[in-house]
Amino acid sequence: MKKIGIFFGSDTGNTEKIAKLIQKYIGDNVSCLYDISNTSQKDIEDFNFLIFGVPTWYYGEVQCDWDDFLPTLKKINFSNKIVALFGCGDQEDYSEYFCDAIGTIYDILKKNKANIIGKWSTEDYYFEQSKALLNKKYFYGLILDEDRQANKTEYRIKQWVKQIIPYFNTH
């Protein structure tokens, strides 16, 4: 069995594309992709190492498939799981809600005792507010803006994967 589960929700295809890039850099020999719209509680419980891709829609909302999955997510005990988060948002048109969906998922995971890794610097992002902030210098996970900074996406993914992969290899 592959040891890292990469779960994503995607309406436009951006988050799915990013999930596939993350899988490419981690290695498809050790990771599996799951669309959250076709995911069961057991699918997540089968992995100790998880990556969740959560885009933000409109005014800070969780993408519709993730929104449908939230009641199930709230039931899962994450105490023996390591979880990394990535998300997509638009820092210009939705500057006051930038990647808020990551904050929503983070709160559920923390409440359910997940070990969350993969914080990402806020440097070079321009937004007013975000519920995805660990503090003023870091987001809870990798934040990507395919609308305004698509040219930085692949570099950011490579750097983030380098940061998180040791956690998956040593636990």
UniProtKB/Swiss-Prot annotation:
> Could you say which cofactors this protein requires?
FMN
Looking up SUPFAM superfamilies in the UniProt record yields:
Flavoproteins (SSF52218)
- One MF term from GO for this chain? electron transfer activity
> According to its UniProt entry, what is the function of this protein?
Low-potential electron donor to a number of redox enzymes.
State the NCBIfam families in the record: flav_long, PRK09267.1-3, PRK09267.1-5
The entry assigns this protein to a family as follows: Belongs to the flavodoxin family.
Q: What is this protein called?
A: Flavodoxin
Q: Which organism is it from?
A: Buchnera aphidicola subsp. Acyrthosiphon pisum (strain APS) (Acyrthosiphon pisum symbiotic bacterium)
